[in-house]
């Protein structure tokens, strides 16, 4: 494997361990030329997957892009990095197990939304707002209506403590609650 620091092709594996519940192998390597140490992670790839975009373009599936999207949706939420990796691994396994090599992007989005809905409802709404390209507040209202316990004013648009804090910051009038 090529050294990411100097580009030399001769690196040695110093340590290998199971990673991500055995779904991958973590290897510590050292470069023979510059002596820098680095880590690689190897995963099994059952088949090459392709994403079919809305305009019918076919692009290679990128696990890192999926992971980045999930991380963005879960940013500042109470979900640790290890759980995010398990979520992404599970999503990739489901895609590979589907038996399809060409997967529509909308199907990947639905799969991610279904998983995020079970993990964190805020992350689900964040992801859905990008996936479905929300343009107006009514788009958010519609998705909130689909969530049990949020219909017909059961839950304020801004939860109580947050609404009070925002009202205190915004001065007279504050934030109107639904």
From Swiss-Prot:
Its cofactor is Zn(2+). Keywords: ATP-binding, DNA-binding, Metal-binding, Nucleotide-binding, Repressor, Transcription, Transcription regulation, Zinc, Zinc-finger. InterPro entries: ATP-cone_dom (IPR005144), NrdR-like_N (IPR055173), RNR_NrdR-like (IPR003796). Residues 7-21 have a biased composition (Basic and acidic residues). One of its GO terms (biological process) is negative regulation of DNA-templated transcription. Binds 1 zinc ion. A zinc finger (unnamed) spans 3-34. It holds the Pfam family Zn_ribbon_NrdR. Negatively regulates transcription of bacterial ribonucleotide reductase nrd genes and operons by binding to NrdR-boxes. Belongs to the NrdR family. This is Transcriptional repressor NrdR. The lineage of its organism: Bacteria, Pseudomonadati, Pseudomonadota, Alphaproteobacteria, Acetobacterales.
